[in-house]
């Protein structure tokens, strides 16, 4: 595995044995450390590269469709004048702290605009979270005859952010049950058990809200939706996060109906940041089986 593991104590193994070295890595070519090429006596280029696009063509992986979800609040920040009374109240403690740090007298009024890169540090906005969840539940790829959103990972900013996402989901969709959307990070005691359940098609959760833990190294072929709800700065991590949805999955929608693609909802401008494109998501116009049966009963009643 020719990236991070070739350095430190593991490097001694390669120095000790006089043999042919074959290095394999999923790290994007532009991000591979020069020392890796030096170790393998290469001139900053790999001997062979098998791209994601080639793997899609050869039907080893599945492509994604992309929706760049515009959130003025996330991308451009928050203007004080645009805040509701409730949202201003949420920021009062922040402003009180800043007044103390800046030596501003307590009796003096103080507030300021919040920049886009401060959003998740200072404010978890329910309206934004609700929009993210509504977009997923409305336009995400579905299973079980349209009754359920397919297995989904929501990449959250931090533990508090992830907690609020789960709380809002349970308030908006109580009929789905408490296990439908669950938080997975290292602060959750039974996170290994939840991950094991998430990997099983017939078990809940259907939606995993992850803080770093599911960004890399997890293989769940049933994943149909990825929600990028945090800002990503690492190209390596970004590519690996996309990889969570690329696995093949046979008979996912029924006998002979295999997974053909997956959806990505990007709320934080990550695909623009990394100059990555994708075909547009198809807006959902299909009704679930329950909805179709209800409409049929109405027609019969008429």
Residue ranges, per PLM feature:
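Short, conserved "post-DEAD/DEAH" coupling segment immediately C-terminal to helicase motif II
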Residues: 3-24, 30-38
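Conserved catalytic network of the ASCE P-loop NTPase/AAA+ motor domain
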Residues: 13-17, 30, 58, 143-147, ...
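Conserved C-terminal RecA-like helicase domain
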Residues: 98-210
């Amino acid at each position: 595995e020719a990236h991070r593991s070739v350095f430190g104590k593991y490097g001694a193994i390669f120095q000790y044995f006089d043999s042919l070295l074959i290095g394999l890595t999923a790290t994007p070519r532009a991000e591979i450390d020069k020392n890796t090429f030096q170790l393998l006596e290469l001139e900053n280029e790999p001997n062979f590269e098998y791209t994601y696009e080639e793997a899609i063509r050869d039907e080893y992986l599945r492509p994604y469709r992309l929706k760049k979800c515009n959130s003025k609040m996330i991308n451009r920040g928050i203007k004080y004048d645009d805040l509701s009374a409730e949202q201003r109240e949420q920021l009062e403690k922040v402003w009180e702290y800043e007044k103390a740090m800046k030596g501003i007298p307590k009796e003096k009024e103080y507030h300021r605009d919040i920049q886009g890169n401060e959003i998740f540090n200072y404010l978890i906005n329910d309206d934004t979270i609700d929009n993210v969840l509504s977009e997923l539940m409305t336009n995400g790829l579905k299973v079980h005859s349209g009754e359920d959103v397919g297995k989904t990972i929501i990449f959250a900013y931090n533990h508090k952010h992830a907690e609020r996402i789960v709380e809002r989901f349970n308030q908006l969709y109580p009929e789905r049950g408490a296990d439908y959307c669950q938080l997975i990070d290292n602060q959750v005691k039974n996170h290994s058990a939840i991950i094991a359940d998430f990997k099983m098609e017939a078990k809940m959760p259907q939606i995993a809200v992850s803080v770093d833990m599911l960004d890399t190294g997890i293989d769940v072929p049933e994943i149909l939706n990825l929600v990028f709800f945090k800002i990503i700065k690492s190209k390596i991590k970004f590519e690996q996060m996309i990889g969570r949805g690329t696995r093949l999955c046979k008979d996912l929608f029924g006998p002979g109906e295999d997974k053909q693609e997956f959806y990505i909802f990007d709320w934080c401008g990550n695909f623009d940041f990394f100059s990555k494109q994708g075909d547009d998501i198809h807006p959902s116009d299909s009704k679930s089986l329950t909805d179709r049966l209800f409409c049929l009963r109405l027609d019969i009643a008429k």
